[in-house]
Amino acid sequence: LSDFDGRTSKLSEYTGNGNWTLVMIWSSTCGTCRREAPRIEAFHQRHANAGVEVLGISVDSLEGVMNARRFVRQNRLTFPNLVGDPEDVALLYLDTTGTHLLGTPGFLLFNPRGRLRTFGVGPVDVGRLDRIVGEISLVR
């Protein structure tokens, strides 16, 4: 994984830091990703000051970073985004969840200690995520 300027990064840099972390795995050519991006941005805005972080990971690879940048700009995403090769991101998903990434968007939700709480592929139930981070944040 790397940022859009090519600096290497790791998922572990964004998880286990005392905050909930929602990861959205996306592709600039994915129609469902385009529909989900504004919903995830709204989730990010709602929880920005409540111990919840959002991270995007594009599978457009470094060669497609211009498409990834355009996707972020067009969807007005204010949360950090990384880019990775599709195979590397799929392996990361498999290592993290024990299941294959069957498409995009993919979602991973980590608790404040960095443990995977829930995951899935396809449209996400943002209301469910709101409830999960809301309930547990009270106990933080």
Residue spans for each PLM region:
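Thiol/disulfide oxidoreductase modules built on the thioredoxin-like
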Residues: 75-77, 85-134
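Non-globular targeting/processing and membrane-anchoring segments
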Residues: 1-2, 136-140
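Structural microenvironment flanking redox-active thiols in thiol-disulfide oxidoreductases
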Residues: 34-76, 86-94
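Hydrophobic beta-strand positions
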Residues: 1-3, 25, 109
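Short pre-active-site segment immediately N-terminal to redox-active cysteine/selenocysteine motifs
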Residues: 18-21, 26-29, 61, 103
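A short beta-strand-turn-helix
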Residues: 1-21, 46
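Hydrophobic beta-strand anchors of alpha/beta hydrolase catalytic cores
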Residues: 22-23, 54, 107
